[in-house]
Amino acid sequence: MNNKLFLRNKQHINLGTIGHVDHGKTTLTTAISYLLNLQGLSKKYNYSDIDSAPEEKIRGITINTTHIEYETLTKHCAHIDCPGHSDYIKNMIIGATQMDIAILVISIIDGIMPQTYEHLLLIKQIGIKNIIIFLNKEDLCDDVELIDFIKLEVNELLIKYNFDLNYIHILTGSALNVINIIQKNKDYELIKSNIWIQKLNNLIQIIDNIIIPTRKINDYFLMSIEDVFSITGRGTVVTGKIEQGCINLNDEIEILKFEKSSPNLTTVIGLEMFKKQLTQAQSGDNVGILLRNIQKKDIKRGMILATPNKLKVYKSFIAETYILTKEEGGRHKPFNIGYKPQFFIRTVDVTGEIKNIYLNENVQKVAIPGDKITLHIELKHYIVLTLNMKFSIREGGKTIGAGIITEIKN
């Protein structure tokens, strides 16, 4: 872990780019860093810095979520660039669970595509209210009516999924044009009046002006583990976004695993955010936590770090659930009691079995796409569950439902 200290002089937020494959998410992330770099607020990240895995470079798509850091005038930003390809939607869900603001990128040339629907539904289910819709590749379209039609179509989709339009911003622009302009002229004063630069500055200004809800700093500490790795000679580091509370160096915390046994107690011996050391991390921070006497093989993504004696693990619960229709990208056919899809809860995905189906308190044999029903679900293994927690249901590479936990069974 690094020796440089993290300076907390601006509000820290987590935001990210989502959307269909090849609509320009990574290009937009690159363009934002280029423009802020000219203004002295960010390191410049090239496309290759963000799509860093060998397979990503070969295929030209983002597979894993990538985190980069930059500052605006009022905020310190952790930017998560999420994959758009349907094969890697699991990684997108993990990235989206960390966001305060989602930037949904839509190509004006292609319009709304299958992953656009799915990503919107997922961020709604995760609970992200603040959304910036960036209609990209405007330079390739001279049909004003087409742009207006796509705006209308997006608006109708947001209303359909019950988004609060007071928290939605719809912008147009060209991320690639911004990059090309800056590569040719690195004097910000000479290019700041360019229409494409102005359009991207509008997006950055919206990020600056969005008010992030008060963090749950005074609650007990809770973090869902996103990743784990070892540092030779130091120990095991777990990463993730702190959901609530604070954590300090030398604090004792517990690891809640996927089994009903006594949690592992450990001590925090290092805290880091974007390669800078912290003495304290708080709700909303994306951190790496160095743990004492813990081996990498004993930690899995989706396990929970928490203040001791605050949480328990369960595997059975009741949930109010909506089953997506075929038109929404869901199942084409009903499912029965005994159906075993995947459940995505925080950063974990786990198989679960439908034990019972209820409609208006009456037991049903089947659930039909489009139904709003109550399900009794039993997971394959134990995880930390809390009331009112939201989750997604997936099968065969697509989202088929979404729900909220209303009762936890011992």
UniProtKB/Swiss-Prot annotation:
Keywords: Apicoplast, Elongation factor, GTP-binding, Hydrolase, Magnesium, Metal-binding, Nucleotide-binding, Plastid, Protein biosynthesis
KW Magnesium (keyword) present: yes
Positions with a binding annotation for GTP: 19-26, 81-85, 136-139
Domain (tr-type G) ranges: 10-214
Region annotated G5, chain positions: 174-176
Molecular function GO labels: GTP binding; GTPase activity; translation elongation factor activity
Coiled-coil regions listed: none
Name of this chain's protein: Elongation factor Tu, apicoplast
Source organism: Plasmodium falciparum (isolate 3D7)
Gene encoding the protein: tufA
